[in-house]
Amino acid sequence: MISLEDLDEVSVAQYRQLLGSVRPGHPFLKWDDKGLLLKLGGWKKDRYTGKEGLTVAGLLMFGKTESIVEAFPDYHVDYQEIPESGERWIDRVYPDGTWEANLFQFFHLVWPKVSRSLPKTFKLKNGQRHDEGAVHEALREALANTLIHADYFGIGGVVIKKYTDCFLFSNPGCLLISQAQYY
């Protein structure tokens, strides 16, 4: 089984800090890393064998790059910003060894790049300014869904491309329903 040694402790600490800032006093915050992962579904103990370890979701979300690639040899996440000329990318995020290429880190590196060109809205909610509108929500959902619904056992990786006039989100896998049902 995949163990705590396969976990990127920095990612878990950052997640814990993010959860604490968004939901102070959340009951999951009182647990150690293993307990937190258990509550999130990232750690599992087999009640019949007693074996325990990281789940696939826990590994993908918070794992070390090497451990993820060992479990998923074709794992690759890639963000590219393509200029108007259509030539080679001008900004890119991919597993280059400078960061742990788990889904948590990828999302937090890529989301600011995806959202920075979007127009800012102004709304007050509970006396707090909120700059994100419906387009921000839709793109954040598209990014999250691309990562969550990828078939990491499949061939090919997650690729997010930001063009001057559109975004392309692609991942390995297929629709679980027919195209007729989808449309």
Q: PLM features: residue spans?
A:
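Active-site helix-to-loop segments that bind/position phosphate- or nucleotide-bearing substrates
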Residues: 1-156, 161-183
